[in-house]
Amino acid sequence: MSAILEGTPDKRLVLVTGRAYPELAEKVAECLGTEILETTSYDFANGEMYVRFTEPVRGADVFVLQCHSGDINKWIMEQLIMIDALKRASAKSITVVAPFLGYSRQDKKHRGREPITARLIFDLFHAAGADRIMTVDLHAAQEQGFFDGPVDHLTAMPVLLDYVRSALDLGNTTIVSPDAGRIKVSEQWAAKLGNLPLAFIHKQRDITRPNHAEAHGIIGDVDGRDCVVIDDM
């Protein structure tokens, strides 16, 4: 099986992946009936990374799949290097596939002299040579406007709804919003599952203390019920 999925003479699809989670790319390739383009990737002793593709990609539509989890900064950098290599190898188009887009939570300034790092990430992908970005459930849908090109903003809600329907007794299930920012999405979940009861956690976050939030109470009926908490990331 070829690593290049042939279409019309001017249409070739190529899937490449970084080292963060190659198992996902293998499943995608299986669904597409193709193979992942072989890539030589390794780290130098000083921490720098090297990437080279073993087959030509000239004129191909290339999808670069990388999961931004674990060592997030390393995997974003590796994906940027892959994009640069593809651009210099004359790929026809380059699509970034990042199921979880790193730094998506940092989409606005809370205080003075803070960065908007989500915008920076989109700018870096554009500067490296990406033509399009495909991602799932951004922290805020408005982030699509950070990229100067098409953004395919997918949602996992249909898949997760099917799981909840099959795994839980909906007659004894409550949808829970973990904070004020997720109430709207939690209402959508409750409606799609048959107008389930909705609860809300009153939570406050101290922006001066990283990774710290304090829950002050919960509004709604959760006693003895299965709770589905609709958080973002």
Summary of predicted features, one role per range:
Residues 1-233:
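PRPP-associated nucleotide enzymes
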